Amino acid sequence: HVSQRNASTPNPHFPADMIVAEQKRRENIVEYLLYMWQVEDLIRANALDSDRIRRTLVARYDVTDDVRKRIAQWYDNLADMMRSEGIVEHGHLQINRNVVILLNDLHLSLLRNPQETTYGALYYKALPSIVRLRAKSGGAEMTEIETCLTALYGYLLLRLQGAPVSPETLEAVREINLMLTFLAEKYKEERDITHPH
């Protein structure tokens, strides 16, 4: 399932954020995406400045100089991509938007498949919350899956900040989380079939 801690904060026990990202990508695509959105925000919080990123993000790792250079290069590459894609202040990298597209395609495929009754039930249970969230977003052009991911990410940020969360929001997040957990498992199943180790 999508763990609030793992999806919202880097785990200091791993040697590098890039390793965490790769592990999450293999294990749970939803956690990977939420993690990468947080990385984008951390890069923005450091003004996409290579020196600041090294001081605040890279320096916290107790690793060899070679590994530290690779971590710094990973952040630099992401910051460069953010600049070139024009998402310095907001928005998501194309590599991350592509994951949302893949998840949305799988979501639609599962809903069309009459044998996928579990996913359909999870979706229809979460649908009233999704509709409310879409209405609150001010008509932003988002797919249902992007709406769900954005809601979950917003919830994780609130938790990080220690902000209060209403019972209605908690229930919506619980329903959405169940649906996204199932979607992530299906994504992994399909990926394991098409890309066996």
Model-identified regions with their sequence ranges:
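Intrinsic-disorder-associated, low-complexity terminal segments enriched in Asp/Asn/His/Tyr and depleted
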Residues: N11-H13
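N-terminal interaction modules that seed assembly of large macromolecular complexes
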Residues: I19-H90
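A structural motif
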Residues: V20, D62, R70, A79-R83, ...
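Short, charged, amphipathic alpha-helical segments
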Residues: R55-T56, R97, Y124, L170
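Charge-rich, solvent-exposed alpha-helical interaction surfaces
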Residues: W74-N77, L102, K125, S129, ...
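A charged, amphipathic interaction segment
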Residues: L93-Y153
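Glycine-rich, aromatic-bearing surface loops/beta-hairpins
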Residues: V131-H197
